[in-house]
């Protein structure tokens, strides 16, 4: 209950309230940018659960996102399955893929786990291209159904989904399971010596991360109306997700949302700079990571504790 009296809770509550009212104040274009940013925020939060708490660096978050997105797209486009069932199926498919990837990968140590997740993304990219008759190949595939054609409704869907995921993931991170994950990530040997099943908890974390990633991937394609390698599987998208989570603050969960919103909005507004766009955003992100290694939210929280 102490959390509900904390400054972080009230800041989050006011932020959500203001965000919910934004459709009455800003243009449809800005709403579309923020809508995409909110889905990326869920991607970043899911990645932070695995890295920030379990201590495992997943270099291929788009493998899980892509599994969910393409599963939903194929079911909707080919078989006419309604959106809610497609989203559920996408979550289950991503979880299944997460389990199949996590069980062998977590037996590895050091950088090898990250390399396995990166290779998984490359395999999925090749699968999409090879089976173009089913997936649409490099062009991508459209879905006949979308969440809404109204920008305001799409925005509220994304915001509501983001808030729900944030509450669930933040609650998990503060639970007994979250504390065990954090202990396992910081010192797996010591955690095992205390009697915790480190591998089981890390596999569970991978599955939870996959669940949220796959669900968000499905929601994103039903917002955009299409699934393609460039939007849900590309390695560059995965890099952006990782930067967003680190930028916001490791082990904060909510900081990942701040990082995602910053990256997406900055990329959009700096688009007129052309090739300088990526350079400027990367330079800002690098400066924040170097001077504020705890991330933006992590730095703010620790500074508040010191005061």
For each feature predicted by the language model, list its residue ranges:
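Alpha-helical transmembrane segments within multi-pass membrane transporters and channels
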Residues: 79-122, 258-260
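Alpha-helical transmembrane segments of multi-pass integral membrane proteins
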Residues: 22-25, 99, 148-184, 203
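Extracellular/periplasmic helix-loop junction at the C-terminal end of a transmembrane helix
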Residues: 117-150, 178, 299
